[in-house]
Swiss-Prot record:
Record has Ligase as a keyword: no
Record field: catalytic activity: alpha-D-glucosamine 1-phosphate + acetyl-CoA = N-acetyl-alpha-D-glucosamine 1-phosphate + CoA + H(+); N-acetyl-alpha-D-glucosamine 1-phosphate + UTP + H(+) = UDP-N-acetyl-alpha-D-glucosamine + diphosphate
PANTHER family linked: BIFUNCTIONAL PROTEIN GLMU, NUCLEOTIDYL TRANSFERASE
Reported function: Catalyzes the last two sequential reactions in the de novo biosynthetic pathway for UDP-N-acetylglucosamine (UDP-GlcNAc). The C-terminal domain catalyzes the transfer of acetyl group from acetyl coenzyme A to glucosamine-1-phosphate (GlcN-1-P) to produce N-acetylglucosamine-1-phosphate (GlcNAc-1-P), which is converted into UDP-GlcNAc by the transfer of uridine 5-monophosphate (from uridine 5-triphosphate), a reaction catalyzed by the N-terminal domain.
Record's subcellular location: Cytoplasm
Active-site residues per Swiss-Prot or TrEMBL entry: 332
Residues that, per the record, bind Mg(2+): 99, 218
Full protein name: Bifunctional protein GlmU
Segments of this protein annotated with the region N-acetyltransferase: 242-427
Main EC class the enzyme belongs to: transferase
Leader sequence segment: none
Family: In the N-terminal section; belongs to the N-acetylglucosamine-1-phosphate uridyltransferase family.
Region of interest called Linker, as start-end residue ranges on this chain: 221-241
């Protein structure tokens, strides 16, 4: 059986972040989670080597069926040191890095198909400056040369080490104990095994991999580029499954959102952790942790977490938060928070549910076929029963019974010729 070991113990100092490198997110999901999910497509036998922010990373991956190993950096530093603490269980062992969130299972599968003592990934770069070169003869790796040690011919080699390896079990069991930390950094290097194996005449096959999938994330700039690629993959998947997207390069969809039926997404939309079913989300709208079914949203609307909208129209500049809306219309300029509103109800422009008193939040419940006039304030907690009309400009702070009209306005007072008196002008 294949065993996969994911090396994720490093600090990632080049990220310049208080967050562990592998916990940085692309489209809402951490790098380490992407790698685990792709690995699980190949084998259930997965080990993750951790150290930096051990508790936080462990908490992130606790729901995955993986074995967690804590690397002792004092006794066994380095990539080779990480392997010294992992029991070798598989007939073949695939070594991955925790900062490669774009890897794909189908590409990793190709490593198993090669018959060699070691399979080593290489990337062909247009500009390999700054990288060590991999010398390959007839598909076999002969040596890895650091750029500073390379001769003129070796500097012309476009192949560099991509950092992913497949070892036969016997190779690791034989050569891991031979690893030495007799170097300037006092670390155990995994690449030293490559040198020992080559000297002993064993086979090291090179496999060329896609730079986009295997290039590691080492900085915030790398992270932004990787997220751009991941978001593109997510959008392509949903478009291939029938979702219409207008100017998709302007749309952000995270890894946890899903679409069912015929859906349409306008330009500039942001959709996070949401389920969109047979609905249209129009331009420049934001939907977060919500369920939208048979509804039209936007343009320029915001649907916040814990909201469920069914058969509903939400227009421009309407914000919905933690509300269940069934068959209603809120065309423009409203805030509906902590609300339950039933079918046939019309929400006039400027309607506000006043759900917070400075200490706690309260619910607004509105029944069926309610007409709420413009510029209405609903002071929660409040219940409005079916078939109610609320006049424009009203402030509602009491429950309203079925079939009633509610109106709260100061009487209109008209003072004749006031304008002329105020400004001292004649009529």
């Amino acid at each position: 059986m294949l065993q996969i070991i994911i090396l994720a113990a490093g600090k990632g100092t080049r990220m310049k972040s208080s967050t562990a490198k592998v916990l940085h997110k692309l489209c809402g999901k951490s790098m380490i989670e992407y790698i685990i999910e792709e690995s699980l497509k190949l084998t259930p036998n997965i080990d993750i080597v951790l150290n930096h922010q051990f508790e936080k990373v462990s908490e992130t991956v606790k729901n995955y069926p993986v074995n967690i190993v804590k690397q002792d950096l004092e006794k066994f530093p380095g990539t080779g040191g990480a392997l010294k603490e992992v029991p070798i269980k598989g007939d073949k062992v695939l070594i991955l890095n925790g900062d490669m969130p774009l890897i794909k299972a189908e590409e990793l599968k190709k490593f198993e198909e090669l018959d060699a003592d070691i399979v080593m990934s290489v990337m062909k770069l247009d500009n390999p400056d700054g990288y060590g070169r991999v010398v390959i003869e007839n598909g076999n790796v002969k040596k890895i040369v650091e750029q500073k040690d390379a001769n003129e011919e070796e500097l012309k080699i476009p192949y560099v080490n991509a950092g992913v390896y497949l070892f036969k079990k016997d190779v690791l069991n034989k050569y891991l104990p031979k690893l030495s930390n007799n170097n300037s950094q006092k670390e155990y290097y995994l690449t030293d095994i490559i040198e020992m194996v080559e000297k002993d005449g064993l086979t090291i096959k090179a496999i060329e991999v896609d730079e986009e999938n295997f290039k590691g994330v080492n900085s915030k700039k790398d992270l932004a580029h990787a997220e751009e690629i991941m978001c593109e993959r997510i959008k392509n998947f949903w478009m291939q499954n029938g979702v219409i997207m207008h100017l998709p390069e302007t749309i952000y969809i995270d890894a946890y959102s899903s679409f069912e039926g015929e859906c349409e997404i306008g330009n500039g939309c942001v959709i996070k952790k949401s389920v969109i079913i047979e609905s249209e989300v129009r331009a420049l709208s934001v939907v977060e942790e919500a369920v939208i079914k048979n509804s039209g949203i936007g343009p320029m609307a915001r649907i916040r977490p814990k909201s469920e909208l069914v058969n509903t129209h939400i227009g421009n500049f309407v914000e919905v938060k933690a509300s269940r809306l069934n068959g209603i219309k809120a065309g423009h300029l409203s805030y509906l928070g902590d609300s339950e509103i039933d079918e046939g109800t019309n929400i006039g422009a400027g309607t506000i549910t006043c759900n917070y008193d400075g200490k706690a939040k309260y619910k607004t419940k509105i029944g069926k076929n309610v007409f709420i006039g413009s510029d209405t304030q609903l002071i929660a907690p409040v219940t409005i029963e079916d078939d109610v009309m609320i006049a424009a400009g009203s402030t509602v702070n009491k429950d309203i019974k079925k079939g009633s009209l509610a109106i709260s306005r100061a009487p209109l007072k008209i003072i004749k010729n006031f304008y002329y008196k105020f400004f001292g002008r004649e009529n």
